[in-house]
A protein has these predicted regions:
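Residue-level recognition of conserved beta-strand positions in structured domain cores
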Residues: 39, 52, 71-73, 80, ...
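Short acidic-glycine-tyrosine-enriched beta hairpin
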Residues: 8, 13, 31, 66, ...
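A hydrophobic, small-residue-rich beta->alpha segment in the mid-to-C-terminal subdomain
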Residues: 115-130
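Ligand-binding loop in jelly-roll beta-barrel domains
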Residues: 68, 88-114
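Conserved hydrophobic/aromatic beta-strand scaffold that supports enzyme active sites
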Residues: 24, 37-39, 59, 75, ...
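A short, N-terminal "cap"/entry segment at the start of jelly-roll beta-barrel domains
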Residues: 1-35, 128-171
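A short beta-strand-loop-beta hairpin characteristic of the jelly-roll/cupin
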Residues: 47, 53-82
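Active-site region of the double-stranded beta-helix
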Residues: 24-35, 44-57
Length: 171
């Protein structure tokens, strides 16, 4: 018999991780599916290094908050209700802006990013953003990232860059 997969915060199958300055909740999909869904809570100011995935389209739906996104030569301001899909091979980064944490659903067609989170994350005892970020040594972070199809190629987006993009954008 095929059964539906249902996760909830109280479900013993739901995995949650503290990763860098993020809370990551891993949602299960039906058996045999390659789809990976991660719910991430990102604090204001959170910004990953400019990076590229060679075999993963980085796709997310924004549930809460506002972000400035750089994908290739494009910059945009996005918020709740936006769907963002950045193609593999294109450098990208973002920064959470405003006065509210961002909450996004990542939807990926392979497990490389989820496995990156699992490799460096710390199991979360509660569904809250870590009070103290969990940052591994930068050389370890870069090594594990590259092993999971994430190649850092530049710095995170600075607050000044995000502010300049916000100032130039009518929203």
């Amino acid at each position: 018999m095929i059964r539906a997969v249902v996760d909830s915060p109280q479900n013993e199958h739901t995995l949650a991780w503290l990763f860098l300055d993020l809370l990551v909740i891993e949602h299960r999909c039906a058996p045999g599916m390659d789809t990976v869904v991660l719910e991430m809570t990102l604090p204001v100011g959170s910004s990953p290094a400019l990076h590229v995935h060679d075999s993963l389209d980085d796709t997310w739906y924004i549930l809460d908050g506002e972000m400035v996104v750089r994908c290739g030569d494009d910059t945009l301001v996005v918020g709740a209700g936006y769907w963002v899909s950045m193609p593999r091979g294109v450098p990208h980064t973002f920064r959470v802006v405003g006065d509210q944490d961002a909450r996004i659903l990542l939807v990926h067609d392979n497990a490389s990013f989820r496995d990156f989170i699992r490799a460096l994350g710390v199991p979360a005892a509660a569904y809250v953003v870590p009070a103290q970020p969990v940052f591994p040594a930068m050389d370890e972070l870069a090594r594990v990232a590259r092993a999971h199809d994430l190649t850092p190629i530049g710095p995170p987006m600075s607050a000044d860059d995000a502010d300049a993009i916000l100032a130039a954008t009518v929203h």
